């Protein structure tokens, strides 16, 4: 007799629904007003390896300016809600707000192509493990003067928030684990904001060299006490609202030029089953240093593989934010190591006619040149209750910036108000009712500020990027038709042709 019984398999519940993130195209309406904005020529000069103090005061400090630093520009735009628009009926200030949308960008780079080298006068190298025939002599200090050319990198990231970087640093042990000074420290993965002046990943890894390499001779001078950061593309691509990276362009290339090993006591001995011991008393009785480390090289630079000095048009961003500049700000992150030439400057200390090396003083400087151009589109947002609630959940400071606030509940208590506020007979009244000032979320960070509040124009055809935008948009100047009158034809008497008679 057949008998029904419930299945023995597990019952799987449906997954918990996630909150849906809307694309900006669903609640942002684009207008047909476009503006051009461009910076002035942006220049910076400094020492390529370190910050130098040559005297007292701020002007006595020579900043560190290297071709292997991030340049993070914080572009500030005017408030479009305070604009005098050509059409007063374009938007309703009671129910709508205006925002900027980035539609085009061109990052201009001046200066010729060049390769800038870095190095260390006391670089930790023991053997040339590629071409050596004999081991180096055993001594306490085998450091040498080595210079390298770093990995070649070109990078452009555009967003309304600064980019996110990643690097490795020294971690912390558990409380029950007894730390030993001879053990390798634990590593910790960290996400930090990439700021202007941070060092890029040069081929030695994205790590905190100051805390993980205490000898200060494992890498060149400009990074031996710095942190090299690498953009966390995975984190920025997975960002819910897509504010950190509208789009990015990158090009990297590197090869290993020299192969060295490190000098020092091996912190972790090789397992004995990986090698056979040499003859007792010989140089190869015990294996030498197996800490191998190559030196990077970025190879040739060429104008055929340049990412800069050309326009880019934003039609669809990779995230949910399709180019909307919240809080009227835009962050442009640039890395270009193909123009990293370091100037060697020489001055004579005496007027001697013969050359003597000690009579000259040598200096190093590095210069950079930038030019930023943008095309912005004016957009508006219909502030319905649903959209306002969504924007408040996305960023609660956005509505406050638009002068929309949440009204406090009505108070039933009776408040006190003094007549003489400056009187010493009453308690101090300072700060009792003063509103809290707006706090800049990036006040403690370093960026290169580019102010475009007075540099926007609707005359796109008067600027190079504006003409390129009009050309790709299909707008062309109208050709003036010149009417030319044709001269009246002169009447000629028709000539009668006679036929020849056939015989």
Swiss-Prot record:
One of its GO terms (molecular function) is structural molecule activity. InterPro entries: Capsid_L1_Papillomavir, Capsid_L1_sf_Papillomavir, dsDNA_vir_gr_I_capsid. The keyword Disulfide bond applies. GO terms for cellular component: host cell nucleus; T=7 icosahedral viral capsid. It is found in: Virion; Host nucleus. Pfam families: Late_protein_L1. Residues 475-503 are annotated as: Disordered. Keywords: Capsid protein, Disulfide bond, Host nucleus, Host-virus interaction, Late protein, T=7 icosahedral capsid protein, Viral attachment to host cell, Viral penetration into host cytoplasm, Virion, Virus endocytosis by host, Virus entry into host cell. Gene3D superfamilies: Major capsid L1 (late) superfamily, Papillomavirus. Self-assembles into homopentamers. The capsid has an icosahedral symmetry and consists of 72 capsomers, with each capsomer being a pentamer of L1. Interacts with the minor capsid protein L2; this interaction is necessary for viral genome encapsidation. Interacts with protein E2; this interaction enhances E2-dependent replication and transcription activation. Belongs to the papillomaviridae L1 protein family. This is Major capsid protein L1. It comes from Human papillomavirus 62. The lineage of its organism: Viruses, Monodnaviria, Shotokuvirae, Cossaviricota, Papovaviricetes. The gene is L1.
């Amino acid at each position: 007799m057949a008998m029904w019984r419930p299945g023995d398999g597990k019952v799987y519940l449906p997954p918990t629904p996630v909150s849906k993130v809307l694309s900006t195209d669903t609640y942002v309406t684009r207008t047909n007003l476009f503006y051009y904005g461009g910076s002035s020529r942006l220049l910076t000069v400094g020492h390529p390896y370190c910050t130098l103090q040559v005297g007292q005061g701020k002007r006595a400090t020579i900043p560190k300016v290297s071709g292997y630093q991030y340049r993070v520009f914080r572009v500030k735009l005017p408030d479009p809600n305070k604009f005098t628009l050509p059409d007063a009926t374009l938007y309703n200030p009671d129910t709508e707000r205006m925002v900027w949308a980035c539609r085009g960008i061109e990052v201009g780079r001046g200066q010729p192509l060049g390769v800038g080298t870095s190095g260390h006068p006391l670089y930790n190298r023991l053997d040339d493990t590629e071409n050596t025939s004999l081991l180096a002599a055993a001594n306490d200090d085998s450091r040498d003067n080595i210079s390298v050319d770093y990995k070649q990198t070109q990078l452009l990231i555009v967003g309304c928030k600064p980019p996110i970087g990643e690097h490795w640093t020294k971690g912390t042990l558990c409380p029950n684990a007894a730390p030993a000074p001879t053990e390798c420290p634990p590593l910790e993965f960290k996400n930090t904001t990439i700021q202007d002046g941070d060092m890029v990943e040069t081929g030695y890894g994205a790590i905190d060299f100051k805390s993980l390499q205490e000898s200060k001779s494992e890498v060149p001078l400009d990074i031996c006490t710095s942190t090299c950061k690498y953009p966390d593309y995975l984190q920025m691509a997975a960002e819910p609202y897509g504010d950190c990276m509208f789009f990015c362009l990158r090009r990297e290339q590197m090869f290993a030029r020299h192969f060295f090993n490190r000098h020092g006591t091996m912190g972790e001995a090789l397992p004995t089953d990986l090698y056979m011991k040499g003859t007792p008393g010989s140089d190869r009785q015990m294996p030498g240093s197996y800490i191998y480390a190559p030196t990077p090289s970025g190879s040739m630079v060429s104008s055929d593989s340049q990412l800069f000095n050309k326009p880019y048009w934003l039609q669809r961003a990779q995230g949910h934010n399709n180019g909307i500049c919240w809080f009227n700000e835009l962050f442009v992150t640039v890395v270009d190591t193909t123009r990293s030439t370091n100037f060697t400057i020489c001055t004579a200390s005496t007027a001697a006619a013969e050359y003597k090396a000690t009579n000259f003083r040598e200096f190093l400087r590095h210069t950079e040149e930038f030019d930023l151009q943008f095309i912005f589109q004016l957009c508006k947002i219909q502030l319905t209750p649903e959209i306002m609630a969504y924007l408040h959940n996305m960023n609660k400071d956005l509505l406050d910036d638009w002068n929309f606030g949440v009204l406090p509940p009505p108070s039933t208590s009776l408040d006190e108000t003094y007549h003489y506020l400056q009187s010493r007979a009453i308690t101090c009244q300072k700060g009792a009712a003063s509103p809290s000032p707006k706090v800049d979320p990036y006040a403690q960070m370093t960026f290169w500020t580019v102010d475009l509040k007075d540099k926007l124009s609707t005359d796109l055809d008067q600027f190079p990027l504006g003409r390129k935008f009009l050309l790709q948009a299909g707008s062309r100047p109208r050709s003036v038709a010149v009417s030319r009158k044709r001269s009246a034809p002169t009447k000629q008497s028709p000539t009668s042709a006679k036929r020849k008679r056939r015989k």
